[in-house]
Amino acid sequence: MTGHPRPPADGAHTDVCVVGGGPAGLTLALLMLRSGARVTLVERSRSLDRAYRGEILQPGGQALLDALGVLEGARRRGCHEHDGFRLEERGRTLINGDYRRLPGPYNCLLSLPQQHLLTDLLERCRAHPRFTCLTGTKVNGLVEEGGVVRGVVCGGGADGLVVRADCVVGADGRYSTVRKLAGIPYDRIELFDQDVLWCKLTAPATRTVRIFRAGGNPVLAYTSFPDCVQLGWTLPHKGYQALAERGFAHVKERIRAAVPEYADTVDQQLNSFKDVSLLDVFAGSARRWARDGLLLIGDSAHTHSPIGAQGINLAIQDAVAAHPVLCEGLRRRDLSERFLDAVAARRRPETERATRVQVMQSRMMLSTGRVSAAVRPKAAMLVSRTPAYRSVLRRIAYGDQTLRVRSDLFEEGEPATV
């Protein structure tokens, strides 16, 4: 047990302790609950009522959530469909990724507020009597016996609690506490030349995710439910501090110049640094995804750029891939690193592929300089008309198309879906 001279009191034993109530953690929790496992979720935030940026669901993620019985309920809470994405340079369309050409019913990019998705997942988890949810609870230690992870330590002193589990799943994001406590090395890889400054504006809806190149730094823009547009203004990697030192008026003017279509709205609605948030963009990967009794999934195991809207989809796919491995491990009472490595063996190649595609997209769409400006229009026209581009578009949209929700592992007589 790490970090606690006076061990807290033991809590109940559970089959799986999931740390992190994001898309990866809650999807896995529901999958395991539907398969008859006891699941304890530990989430440091007290509620889902907080700001989220990533909310674009690709068709592959939509299909998996639908198979789990979650998509319809989350959509009913409010969402916005986009027909595809477009790269626009000074009013001219260079690339048009038309998702309507993909087979239905998931032939769109779905802007679904993460709060809506997580709320629906959490409600369905709470319908299961084997589910325990510890919100507002921080993990600050692992229970270890002979090098095997046996649970987590939450809090400390008189208010502390030990959650013992057959397997601990770290799904607590890019700065994962579980990963650090487990001593798993993480390689941060500086593959991208841009960071992203996000802001949300009230503006009319559009049907396309767009990348604007209008003379300033490129801007990502998409409609967000109910009546907002999310703007992601790109700026040189690690360059925000120097920019911010020139004052908010300067930052706002740079954003206005980069996206003339929203210039007046930016002027009216962005008033201070509180209205923007910086995303440090980098790639990263844990060197191991597992230890005896412990598994990492989602951003805890691999980190991606926001370009291409892959993060949520990869997280959901990780959960779907981990589900049958954990079910079999619990049945065999084998949750060793060797056994759990089956998850990384399946998912790591896919996540590395996603990173390579994101690097390609970043260089094509976001790079600056005279050479890039001269080459981009011709290169975009040539690339977008090749069969290889259509293949890449399908890979972006679906990811690993062999992944399926293993509903054959679900128990009969489950709680009714809502």
UniProtKB/Swiss-Prot annotation:
It catalyses: 6-methylpretetramide + NADPH + O2 + 2 H(+) = 4-hydroxy-6-methylpretetramide + NADP(+) + H2O. One of its GO terms (molecular function) is FAD binding. Its EC number is 1.14.13.232. Disruption phenotype: Cells lacking this gene produce oxytetracycline with a yield of only 50% compared to the wild-type. FAD binds at residues 15-44, 289-299. It is an enzyme of class 1 (oxidoreductase). One of its GO terms (biological process) is antibiotic biosynthetic process. Signal peptide: none annotated. Its cofactor is FAD. Gene3D superfamilies: FAD/NAD(P)-binding domain (3.50.50.60). Belongs to the PheA/TfdB FAD monooxygenase family. Involved in the biosynthesis of the tetracycline antibiotic, oxytetracycline. This is 6-methylpretetramide 4-monooxygenase. It comes from Streptomyces rimosus. The gene is oxyE.
